[in-house]
């Protein structure tokens, strides 16, 4: 009898653990997050490298907590690479472009091209302020759970 209770207890703990992990996985998958993506060409000029460097520095300095907790991510992709052609097509990318978007893991809910990066690239303070303002707008929506489409 004690063995049966022990086995039953072990099975209950196992079932509970599986359910908890499954629930966590689903919640994590549906969690809203900000993705900042810099699309660049295969051959890169100094201006393109500068924009990426300034964007990366800004994000790492201002949003280190968000990067660590997964609320925000930054990536740099070659839009001319065949692997990224679907994304380049989705966002109508034909030159170097910075995108900020809200997604819930598998679905992009809202996105925007940050077109003033070229205008501000030679003024780091304006560049940084512009990117921070745009990302903060999206972060507000994520924190408030407003972007649910």
Task: Please describe what each predicted stretch is.
Residues 30-63:
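Local sequence-structure signature of Cys/Sec-based thiol-disulfide redox active-site neighborhoods
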Residues 9-20:
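Bacterial N-terminal signal peptides
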Residues 67-83:
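Thiol-based oxidoreductase modules, predominantly thioredoxin-like and allied folds used
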Residues 41-48, 52, 81, 120-128:
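Solvent-exposed, acidic/flexible segments
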